Each structure stands twice: as structure tokens, then as C-alpha cells.
């Protein structure tokens, strides 16, 4: 059995044991998530004081080209729910997101997550990164480094960073600045709200490698879209 299969099997077991319970607890008993109510929260915020998600992430979940805030459109509802609950509990630290998540009820979190997973938003046109940097990132993402015992990113995040829902997020088309920042948080021990796989891997990457992986994943989705559009012409 390959490492990827072993890891995904382990993740599936953890999800089966704890993930379903978390999702059930994240909303009122017997209630189905309401994407329309989620859209209202994204646009207007809540009476409890949570600001509109759209202020930073945009109504369609693409955020902005700066990469200061992640792209949320199409991300798995389970993953988004877990992150919001972790922000609220303090398991994932953020001076910005923690107070916002605390102002959201369990139903609010479920509704917002369900809204974003259903959004099919375009990818913003971004400046092309350095080709050599992207090539280096592609090698790390697809092959890794056997010599340094660095697993390739695609093992967990899927071919081309498409993600492995429900627990593992997509990276394809995510902003390079955000990916690099998140890897730095894992490396420095400031983020640890999941299995320590990411912390172990991030600690083996230097700054240039982090920048390379981030640059590769930022452009991989737009490249796929270009190929698809050319095929239709």
C-alpha cells in the first residue's frame, strides 16, 4: 500500500470517528444547513456582531489578488466548518478570525460553509510567477524529495492540488501569499489544529521551497482553465 493510501486511509478513519460527530454537533439537531442563510451572513454579517465575510473574502469567495485572505469558493464544507470552529475555540489562532468565529452560532457556521462550497467562482487573473520557481515547486508538489524524506504534496492534496474532500483542502488556484504564510505558520508551530503531518513537512522546507510550492499551486488552476478554454475553441 502506498504512503498516500495509508495516509488517506488514516485520515478517513479519523474522519469517520470524529468528523461526522463534529459536523453533527456543528448545527442544531435535525437541521439541514441553509446555504441561503449563509449567503445573507456572507453579505450582511449577523446581529451577534460577526461582520460580513464578503468584506475580506468577497461575496463569491475569491477574496482579492493580494493573497492576504484565502480563496474559499468551492472548498469543502467540512473543512471550512472545522476551521471556523477551531478559530472559535482557539485551537487555530488568528487575531482576525477568532473573534469573528466566536460571534457565529453553530448553525451560522454550517450555513456559511455550505454557501461557500456551492460557489463556482472564476479565478482572478494574476501576474505570472517566475517560471523557474514554478518548475521547482512543481517537482516538490508532484515528486517530493526522497533524499530528504519530503513527501510530495499531491500525496494528500490530490493530483494538481485538487484536494481530497472532506478533510483535505484544495490548493490549486489558492493564492501564493496565503499558501506561503500558512506553511510558515505550520513550520513555526503557530498552526497545529490538525494531524502534525503538515508541521513535519513544513519543517523540512526552506523559504525558497515554500515560495516555490506556493507559486506552483497558485498558477496550476489558471493553467488548467486556459487549456480547457483552448480545447473548446
Predicted feature residues:
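Electrostatic cytochrome c docking/interface patches
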Residues: 25-49, 62, 118-146, 233
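C-terminal segment of classical bacterial N-terminal signal peptides
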Residues: 9, 14-25
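Axial heme c-ligation environment in periplasmic c-type cytochrome domains
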Residues: 55, 64-71, 86-129, 165-170, ...
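The feature marks the first
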Residues: 33-90
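Sequence context surrounding c-type heme c attachment/ligation sites in exported
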Residues: 39-54, 77, 143-154, 169-181
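The canonical Cys-X-X-Cys-His
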Residues: 50-59, 112, 150-160, 213
Amino acid at each position: 500500500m502506498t504512503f498516500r493510501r495509508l495516509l488517506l486511509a488514516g485520515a478517513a478513519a479519523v474522519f469517520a470517528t470524529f468528523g461526522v460527530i463534529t459536523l453533527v454537533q456543528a448545527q442544531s439537531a435535525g437541521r439541514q444547513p441553509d446555504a441561503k442563510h449563509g449567503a445573507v451572513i456572507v453579505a450582511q454579517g449577523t446581529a451577534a456582531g460577526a461582520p460580513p465575510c464578503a468584506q475580506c473574502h468577497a461575496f463569491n469567495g475569491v477574496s482579492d489578488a493580494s493573497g492576504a485572505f484565502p480563496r474559499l469558493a468551492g472548498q469543502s464544507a467540512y473543512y471550512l466548518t472545522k476551521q471556523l470552529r477551531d478559530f472559535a475555540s482557539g485551537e487555530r489562532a488568528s487575531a482576525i478570525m477568532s473573534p469573528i468565529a466566536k460571534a457565529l452560532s453553530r448553525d451560522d457556521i454550517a450555513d456559511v460553509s455550505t454557501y461557500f462550497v456551492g460557489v463556482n467562482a472564476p479565478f482572478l487573473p494574476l501576474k505570472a510567477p517566475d517560471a523557474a520557481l514554478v518548475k521547482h515547486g512543481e517537482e516538490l508538489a508532484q515528486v517530493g524529495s526522497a533524499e530528504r524524506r519530503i513527501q510530495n504534496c499531491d500525496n494528500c492534496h490530490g493530483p494538481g492540488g485538487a484536494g481530497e474532500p472532506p478533510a483535505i483542502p484544495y490548493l490549486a488556484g489558492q493564492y501564493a501569499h496565503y499558501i506561503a504564510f500558512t506553511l510558515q505558520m505550520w513550520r513555526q508551530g503557530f498552526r497545529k489544529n490538525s494531524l502534525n503531518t503538515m508541521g513535519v513537512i513544513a519543517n523540512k522546507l526552506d523559504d525558497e521551497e515554500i515560495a516555490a510550492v506556493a507559486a506552483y499551486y497558485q498558477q496550476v488552476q489558471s493553467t488548467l482553465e486556459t487549456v480547457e478554454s483552448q480545447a473548446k475553441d
